[in-house]
């Protein structure tokens, strides 16, 4: 029996410990009592890990890349996964042959389930290790991304992942909770950039594998032939950090696909069969349709394409032994880790598990009925957040109770107090502040609402100005007069307004394209809505608005902070209302904000903090004419000494969960008991003459709570577009002349041919104007009918007035947009079809690694230019993902630094879809 010894860098994943760091090690094969084991000795020499190979190999995948280095992926049946990187070509080939022989040997003895692997100290064996055999390690090794293809061999992963289903006994999980220092201190696994990389050449020898170990031993001295052929079928895109899927048992797996795979003749998948050689590139692959599950595929592709979201799922070192099989975080992580290199059959299993887990909570997704993508997105985010809260609660309970069986990560260094960041809260959660101010007495109610997305209405404008995401946001944030029962003066007239108190990394905007007609039938609005490349939120923010959580931060967001209200801010709110103001605090019982203080201890405590002012101090302040300032100072001093308010559980936007409710126009504001209210009655503050126009004031009070409450659904029924703030008189006329001259210049220029390459620094005024030119020069939009528009009135050419309106909006985005409050388009989920009861969902996603846009249409993936995407989705765009500019540029820099010098992957050129192929049910 021969013994192989190779040197490389190894990364190990198991269910209980998660993914380790990539570390240098000596890998050796050893035979003991007719059993073959793999011994991994780390360079430190302190620890050795032993893995059973006999009758325990599920798949072996070998990949070669440039510079004669290779990597090998070994998946074991006992839910252990090994990624061996930076192997020499010769070592990788020999190790692959060795493992293939063991895998195909049918005369092996059954594997001992209790001998999965062990970790033990081996200080005495340190002398036996040849230190000169290790590679030299750089201080910061460059971890290369490599394409992961699935072999067509029936012995590979495509087969192995299903072996434990259908009544077969489950393998005993390996006892991975050990005292291995290399595992216990893995709080910072290899950074997972979750970028799709440029594909590399997959080289596989066409020589036959040796039929015995003796043949392999003889073959070690033979020179490998120079001729290689590709024999693979998979995706050239992958993740840096790789997790292996757990055993999919019968209770968790979906063994019968609901819909056959697309055939080559399917008009929804115009994918040509191209012969591959050693230099060819594999076409990207999306997700298979399980039967009307295009809504799920489109949403998941958009989520997985956000690098920060993928990092938070994969690289936190989550103790998987605390996560049940039916948890959404488990199934999503498996799908995210394997989607770029596993077979379509395995993708079906993983997608089926995601659907099954979500259906267990939301029964509406359990069958084969068509569902709404926004409903699925909301349920997915809500359920994932709940899983993370349960995980942190479980770990905290185990730590407080001194549970001996708790995860070893809880007892090593800073991990004992570690709180795992929720990917939903860190990436999508923002805070809106609602202000309700009585017009008669100035009594103000302030409410902070954490949300994961904004649902905005499609307003029918009387102006000929074209609709866009930007001006729809303007209408959403426009001040509105409402009937509201004031608790102080009993009047019913108030002014309501929303502003951002905390921004998110990614802003999700849901466009309500569905509503009820006069016959109370649900219909779709195919009206054209322009999709800007950039959004400016500066009009909806103030100086107290908090920026998104930085990428480098792992601290939980949403910590309760001291409420600080300045006299200037309060004056700005109430300046047009009354010259006599006084600060008080009490509960709210309005029709608009039904909150019961006796059922919410947190709210009562918050109100007590605001209202327990000293009567003596209050009287002195009234005599000195400074009641407002004194009350605020007194409140701040009391609040500093208080502990943080406990975080309360909350709900998603329940007003947007089903189709009939979700597309309601003009819905009323819904609040939950977790919402904190502050009522302010202001008095005796001089009124500034410049603050007479109430609609020009900004937000004023800032809260920051770690919870998700119900978002405002259809709060405004605006009748006109808000005019951007600006100077008057000559300055305004000059601005208009400049804008018109720019527009005229645009209309005289011809559109540039070809696909425009994305520039990482395209955030200046000049670049945005060029982007405007590219979009507005596409005057002939007749082809939009084939791309999803069923409204004949929307197929004509944009007139000059609409063109000028779009250009003015973009100019406003440039000149009014604060870089700290600007957002960049990264994904669009579209519904192709004229009816809410039929149609098809697709997603357009920006690839940070390739710096290009791709359309995901179930299994089909094709490249598309950003300009063409914006035009094609004018009538069908449904959910929009915008990323904060600072986060976008940082992720782009990381992607550029990690890119490999290889050619771009071959993809299907984006073309117009045939006829009504996209109108078929998902």
From Swiss-Prot:
<comment type="function">
    <text>Deubiquitinase involved in innate antiviral immunity by mediating 'Lys-48'-linked deubiquitination of CGAS, thereby promoting its stabilization.</text>
</comment>
<feature type="compositionally biased region" description="Polar residues">
    <location>
        <begin position="170"/>
        <end position="181"/>
    </location>
</feature>
<dbReference type="GO" id="GO:0004843">
    <property type="term" value="F:cysteine-type deubiquitinase activity"/>
</dbReference>
<dbReference type="InterPro" id="IPR028889">
    <property type="entry name" value="USP_dom"/>
</dbReference>
<dbReference type="Pfam" id="PF00443">
    <property type="entry name" value="UCH"/>
</dbReference>
<dbReference type="GO" id="GO:0006508">
    <property type="term" value="P:proteolysis"/>
</dbReference>
<dbReference type="GO" id="GO:0045087">
    <property type="term" value="P:innate immune response"/>
</dbReference>
<keyword id="KW-0833">Ubl conjugation pathway</keyword>
<comment type="similarity">
    <text>Belongs to the peptidase C19 family.</text>
</comment>
<keyword id="KW-0788">Thiol protease</keyword>
<dbReference type="InterPro" id="IPR018200">
    <property type="entry name" value="USP_CS"/>
</dbReference>
<dbReference type="Pfam" id="PF16674">
    <property type="entry name" value="UCH_N"/>
</dbReference>
<feature type="region of interest" description="Disordered">
    <location>
        <begin position="160"/>
        <end position="196"/>
    </location>
</feature>
<dbReference type="InterPro" id="IPR032069">
    <property type="entry name" value="USP37-like_PH"/>
</dbReference>
<keyword id="KW-0645">Protease</keyword>
<dbReference type="GO" id="GO:0005829">
    <property type="term" value="C:cytosol"/>
</dbReference>
<dbReference type="InterPro" id="IPR038093">
    <property type="entry name" value="USP37-like_PH_sf"/>
</dbReference>
<keyword id="KW-0391">Immunity</keyword>
<feature type="active site" description="Proton acceptor">
    <location>
        <position position="840"/>
    </location>
</feature>
<dbReference type="InterPro" id="IPR038765">
    <property type="entry name" value="Papain-like_cys_pep_sf"/>
</dbReference>
<dbReference type="GO" id="GO:0004197">
    <property type="term" value="F:cysteine-type endopeptidase activity"/>
</dbReference>
<keyword id="KW-0378">Hydrolase</keyword>
<keyword id="KW-0963">Cytoplasm</keyword>
<dbReference type="GO" id="GO:0000082">
    <property type="term" value="P:G1/S transition of mitotic cell cycle"/>
</dbReference>
<dbReference type="GO" id="GO:0071108">
    <property type="term" value="P:protein K48-linked deubiquitination"/>
</dbReference>
<dbReference type="InterPro" id="IPR050164">
    <property type="entry name" value="Peptidase_C19"/>
</dbReference>
<feature type="domain" description="USP">
    <location>
        <begin position="285"/>
        <end position="885"/>
    </location>
</feature>
<keyword id="KW-0399">Innate immunity</keyword>
<dbReference type="InterPro" id="IPR001394">
    <property type="entry name" value="Peptidase_C19_UCH"/>
</dbReference>
<dbReference type="GO" id="GO:0031647">
    <property type="term" value="P:regulation of protein stability"/>
</dbReference>
<dbReference type="GO" id="GO:0060340">
    <property type="term" value="P:positive regulation of type I interferon-mediated signaling pathway"/>
</dbReference>
<protein>
    <recommendedName>
        <fullName>Ubiquitin carboxyl-terminal hydrolase 29</fullName>
        <ecNumber>3.4.19.12</ecNumber>
    </recommendedName>
</protein>
<dbReference type="GO" id="GO:0051607">
    <property type="term" value="P:defense response to virus"/>
</dbReference>
<dbReference type="GO" id="GO:0050821">
    <property type="term" value="P:protein stabilization"/>
</dbReference>
<dbReference type="GO" id="GO:0048471">
    <property type="term" value="C:perinuclear region of cytoplasm"/>
</dbReference>
<feature type="active site" description="Nucleophile">
    <location>
        <position position="294"/>
    </location>
</feature>
<dbReference type="GO" id="GO:0005634">
    <property type="term" value="C:nucleus"/>
</dbReference>
